């Protein structure tokens, strides 16, 4: 399946890390949920959690046998973005490369539109 028409991308690095974390939890029903909440130094912030359920209206994106889930309200702020994973000097983390963000905080955890 091509991701050309998907509103949000799920990178290979993020999918590989999710796959590893799911294996550690020994629960193949887990999916990575990304969501937006109010807060942070720029107005909105990203959240990531593992979830077993997919709610009505949720968008799902699959990569390498794992699923990313986004609720409809959060998706409107994430269209065109990429959920990715990085490991560096500041530690390892999931993050969103979001073209809709007009400003972001220094760590990239919060943004405004």
From Swiss-Prot:
Keywords: Iron, Iron-sulfur, Metal-binding. Required for insertion of 4Fe-4S clusters for at least IspG. Gene3D superfamilies: HesB-like domain. Belongs to the HesB/IscA family. GO terms for biological process: iron-sulfur cluster assembly. InterPro entries: FeS_biogenesis, FeS_cluster_insertion, FeS_cluster_insertion_CS, FeS_cluster_insertion_RrpA, HesB-like_dom_sf. It comes from the Bacteria. Binds 1 iron-sulfur cluster per subunit. GO terms for molecular function: 2 iron, 2 sulfur cluster binding; 4 iron, 4 sulfur cluster binding; iron ion binding. Its cofactor is iron-sulfur cluster. Pfam families: Fe-S_biosyn (PF01521). It comes from Vibrio vulnificus (strain CMCP6). This is Iron-sulfur cluster insertion protein ErpA. Homodimer. One of its GO terms (cellular component) is cytosol.
